[in-house]
């Protein structure tokens, strides 16, 4: 049995070292692992994800956070404004990051491509439902029904309601430049 140094159990909150009393096998208590003087924990990682700090989450995990989804039909607005997106129905019980626009890598059809993804309600178009979609750079294949994996690399910006479609398109152009130039 392996337990963290701060694991507790039972109504009287027994600690990990007490497990040896109740468990007949070997008990290994893992010491704390620190990052910048703070304990790395699932709570800390979840907080980073839920606040959109996907780069920090990746540093704590040791690998990029990822989410899988099945490509479904959306409203096709992205295509009409020059930024086609793969609209995703999440299939894992993973945490999506906070609403925003992100630099991502997208694994599709066995290859990885740089892109940008958004999580949010598309308020510029008065959206009310949460959307999870990715613009995959230099990619134009029909992938409806395929499962793709999004690797969250860094947050570009918060979701914003733009005054016009033109203002949105101008911002998406800037987002694309940032995403294409992003380095680890």
Which residues are covered by each model-predicted region?
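Classical nucleotidyltransferase
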Residues: 2-84, 107, 163-167
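Phosphate/ribose-recognition catalytic cores of enzymes acting on nucleotide-derived substrates
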Residues: 74-184
